[in-house]
Amino acid sequence: MSFVLRHNLTAVSLDHLLRIFNEHFPGMVPVTTYLFRKAYGQYGNYEPHFYCPTCENYLGKSTGELQCDICHTVTDSDSSLKSGCFFLVLSLASQIQTLLEEKQTIFQKDWLISDTISDIQCGEEYQKFKESGAMGEDDISLIWNCDGIPLFRSSKYQIWPIQCQVIELEPRERKANICLPCLWFGEKKPYMLTFLRPFVDELSILQKDGIKWKDSANIEHTSKVFDLICSSDSVARPLLRNTKQFNGFYGCDFCYHVGGGPYTSKAPVPKLRTEVEHFDHALAATLEKTVMGVKGPSPLMKLENFQMINGFVPEYQHCVCLGVTMQLANLWFDSRNHEQEWYIGTKSDLLDKELVTFKPPVEIIRVPRSVADRKYWKASEWRSVLLFYALPLLNGVLLRKFWNHLFLFVFAMHILLGEKVKRCDIDVVERSLRKFTLQFEKLYGAANMTFNVRLLTHITTSVRNWGPLWATSTFSFESFNGTLLKYYHGTTHVPEQIVRRFLCWRSLMQKAEKVMADANDGVKKIFSGLLSSHLHSCNSASLNENVRVFVKPCHGKLSLPQSSAVKKLLGVTVSQCVFYHRFIVKGILYHSSSYRKAVKKRINSTVELLDGRLCRILSLLVFSQSMHCVLVRELKNTGKLLCRDSELNITSTFVSEVLQSNNVCAVPTDLLYRKCVLIEARAKNYVIPLPNNIERD
């Protein structure tokens, strides 16, 4: 089953595979696809919920004759299934129960209020909810997303999944264990008053009664489930809130900016929305008249602990990466702006020559592409351009006032995407983004003051409330959207195919516990490889719980400088050792600077140490199972600042201009802090650390 799911086999492919097996090894596997699915099929059920074909009002899940309470249209479940007037609902409770019983360390964290914010649990809103007493020690909370995904190029059909993550899981575990409670399929966007209803109804029950589950000691727990955060883009967000879209009057989800056109700066500053006012506006609104941008009540208002203002976040994938960053690039390079002083399209060929030579580490999956191809760039590519490439590349190309303006934006994002964000730094970023948005109008004109530029003024509030931007971004949800698109073949029964395959994946680990218990190591290794998307970890051996090395090391002698560096660290003289050019420390893959396979398009050896030094990794030296170290060559920091804003008293501390040095050092693996991007631009070398070790493309 793991092979079938990993390689996304069609029913025909599976049938052929079963036939081949049965010809060579009769009776070892089921004979038909029906028997195969019966033996290894999905765990859990799903059911269709119907809506009126005329007005899309919710009709429920009962079979037989159905009558709409609004328009009195009469239909039945069979005809609704044929016409596609339904959506699929999966039990969120059973998915979370399975997750809780698998991840039993879920409640071991003790999040305390401190000077830094390192995840959602450190945010003010989460802490406030925890301190209210509504949330017990065994209770959990959710961050969820709803967005549309087009299925076919030749039609308008799309799916709208609701995805949920458990906040109390570690960030990587959180993103790897997404729950899918509802799936909409159709030619147009879902009618949210209908689509959200089963989701809200189940959440209301889970908030009140909780989920019963047993730990490894067979002790029963009851965990209530609270819906705290919705992270969706600016198109889906007003549908969920039942408000006007951003291009309408009072279309901002967080303040009372008039909108309806360019989001220019207003005096006085528009007042922030509140929960009480939103409820009043929703109740006062009618079909003919909206109130301050609110069209009416949303089903989400039935959830006792979900906030209609602070519960939504201005997530940065669409606002920052696909929003303001893309907008700036189009302003700079679009030929329609050739008469503007910010236009640099005539220099795009020169910039491309440098841009395509940049060699990011493996965490940045996509290598830089030509500026001419920017309409094909993904959100992760725009993120890389903003964080790592733009400032060094455009230095001396953009007029200084535009380049200094860009620095404010880059500075802010480096801090807000940090693994740990200092609360005092958020205040600095808030001033930086305020200046950025005010200058944006002066530099690029009022006509270019888009909603995304306006949304930047609300991002710092989101970080205070719910943690760093990476913690509430839609990147993981969008990635899972791509996974769902692989779960169907052909054009018939698409939602059913997607849901069945999703449930098969969910049940795979449960069934594997029994089936794989007595399997030999070779079979377990194959199974692990089929489950993992990180194939590099399958061919490695463990030195200790934090360090893994890859096969085929080099045996050799240390040079005199290398031997001296090792003696300085370990206190012993060593002449021979084993050299590893690929290794993993705390889940992060490193290469040596001489690793041949990666050197063409990647520089995966530039690191920052815990003491602040910048280095290139030469090799991992292993003397015994318990004695090893990393050999590095230091990069000399020139101390020159790339950029500075004297008014705000901020500098580009996240960019270091460096020179090569001959200083070789040996350091313990625990001293490796984070990977860096090494940029060569304008005949200078710059090192820019990755803001955090959690996000991956």
What are these regions (language model features)?
Residues 17, 147, 199, 227-231, ...:
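Short, conserved catalytic/metal-binding motifs centered on acidic residues
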Residues 70-148, 157, 176, 205-392, ...:
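Charged (Asp/Glu and Lys/Arg) segments that form or flank catalytic channels of large polymer-
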Residues 64, 155-159, 176-177, 194-197, ...:
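Short coil/turn segments at secondary-structure boundaries
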Residues 51-61:
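Short Cys/His-rich zinc-binding micro-motifs
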Residues 46-49, 65, 249:
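Residues immediately within or flanking Cys/His clusters that coordinate Zn2+
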Residues 1-49:
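N-terminal alpha-helical interaction blocks
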